[in-house]
Amino acid sequence: MEDKEGLDAAALAGRILLQNGAEIFRVEETIERIAKSYGMEGNSSFVLSSGIFITEEKDDKHFYANVKHIPLSTAHLDKVAAVNQLSREIETGKYTPAEAIEVLHNIQNMPEKSKTAQIIASGVGSACFGYLFGGSIFDSFAAFFVGSLLWVFLGIMSKRKKRTTKIMLNIGGGLFLTTLSILVYRLGIGDNLNHIIIGSIIPLVPGVAFTNAIRDIANEDYISGIVRLVDALLIAFCVALGVGIIMTVYHRIAV
């Protein structure tokens, strides 16, 4: 029974890591650490970007297995850090398997940052990158406004009763931010439309996903790396498509 609980704890830790943006090698390493800490020396794990497969060979007649399907999702690095810290504490013998599972459930249910904090962070990130790429103070102010409203728009779209696909959400985000950037620019708030758009687009850029894809490929986890890379490139394409549609229409009308 304790072996099964230990395997469940390792699987749950791996699931939380994979769901929240951890690299494949980190997931496998954490699973192995936790399993061995609970005396499961015969454990073997196989991790993909969308699934975890763990087995434990107790003896010739007894095997334990745990399979988890993990859909692609957004990153929550606080949860990744919490699981990493927990795995270190498990190695020191601080938790029994049952206690570790309870802590992992608490980590899994860890609340996100408040909506207000997320909106402000989106605006500040947009403003900073707008300025970093050569925009003026007024461009940064405009990017802050657009970036903040973009996050509100994304929150509304993602909470609709009818589920919005990732493709449509990112195309819609590109359409929204570009339309709002043009409106703000035409009202005379910013100096350069391109810099406003560049700053405002930052909340949609899949930076963590792209970085993890490259790291997975560098660590020879080719299947997971390619899947994550395709996902990141698809997001980038959808955002660019949304921006491009509005800019094309705007320039045709302006001319």
Regions found by a protein language model. Give the residues of each.
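Soluble N-terminal domains of membrane-associated systems
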Residues: 1-95
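Alpha-helical transmembrane segments and immediately membrane-proximal extracytoplasmic
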Residues: 63-76, 109, 113, 117-118, ...
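Interfacial loop-to-helix junctions that mark the boundaries of transmembrane helices
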Residues: 68-71, 133-139, 192-196, 254-255
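Helix-loop-helix junctions within the multi-pass membrane cores of secondary transporters/permeases
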Residues: 95-105, 111-121
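C-terminal ends of transmembrane helices
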Residues: 106-107, 150-163, 211-224
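Core alpha-helical transmembrane segments of integral membrane proteins
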Residues: 112-187
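Generic detector of multi-pass transmembrane helix bundles and their immediately adjacent loops
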Residues: 185-255
